[in-house]
Amino acid sequence: MSLDAILSGAGGATKLGAQMLNSMPVLLIPGLGGSPRIYAPVADALWGFGPVTVANHVRDDTMGAIARRILAEAPPRFALAGHSMGGYIAFEIMRQAPDRVAKLALINTQARPDSPEVRERRGGQLARVKAGGLHEVLDGLYPGFVHPSRHDDSTLRKLVHDMGDDVTSEGFVRQLTAIMARPDSRPTLATIRCPTLVLSSDTDNTLSNTLSAEMADGINGAKLVIIPDCGHLPQPEKPRETAEALVAWMQN
């Protein structure tokens, strides 16, 4: 089956792909302020391998509680992909239930906790969102989310706003609270034994490639893929390149 067939879903690729690969469930976790919309550009390619679910990560305010609830609702064994905050949650899932994760993809994320400076900045964002300024905070984050060539992309900016509305101000506050208190996941890297993809972008102004390389170096056998001319949101910015990397990960 060709990559084009898998990516397009043409010619019965979804059903056939699931049969060929014993229908591995795929669990996707969005980032801060992200909703299932973030994975829409690449989800069809993954349906060729099994059922695809996007986790609900807005209901709890600690990484431990978020991971426990996701695990309670997840299949017994699955391929796990986490984007940004979703990567922080993925690390917590690896600590709680490593044997349930068949494959791991860490997308534009990091293993380090927030520095005091970043935590202080997030505290300001938290206060503004609580005061009703969710879209104001998202507009402030947007330039760091995307490649400079997309700063004036009204469609992409609308996606960020729409996802924020999906999450709601209350959900965003819970997410930020969990992020600010998350543990250092660098000690977890050496414990990961499943096939792992570390996917990053060459122009991610939110989380640098140095952080991606640190994760790839720390996980035995991990593969590092860097998407060119792309910011922090590779799924909508570079959907084909992102889908190709994820399909190769699932085929590994």
Model segments located where?
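Gly/Ala-rich beta-loop-alpha elbow adjacent to hydrolase catalytic centers
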Residues: 82-86, 90
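Catalytic histidine neighborhood in serine/cysteine hydrolases
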Residues: 213-232
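Catalytic histidine-centered segment of alpha/beta-hydrolase-like enzymes
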Residues: 230-243
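Acidic catalytic loop of the alpha/beta-hydrolase fold
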Residues: 203-207
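Conserved HGGG/HGGXW glycine-rich cap/lid loop of the alpha/beta-hydrolase fold
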Residues: 20-69
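Short beta-strand/loop motif that positions the catalytic acidic residue
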Residues: 192, 198-200
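Conserved alpha/beta-hydrolase catalytic His-Asp/Glu region
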Residues: 114-117, 132-191
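Flexible "cap/lid" loop of the alpha/beta hydrolase fold
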Residues: 63, 95-96, 100-139
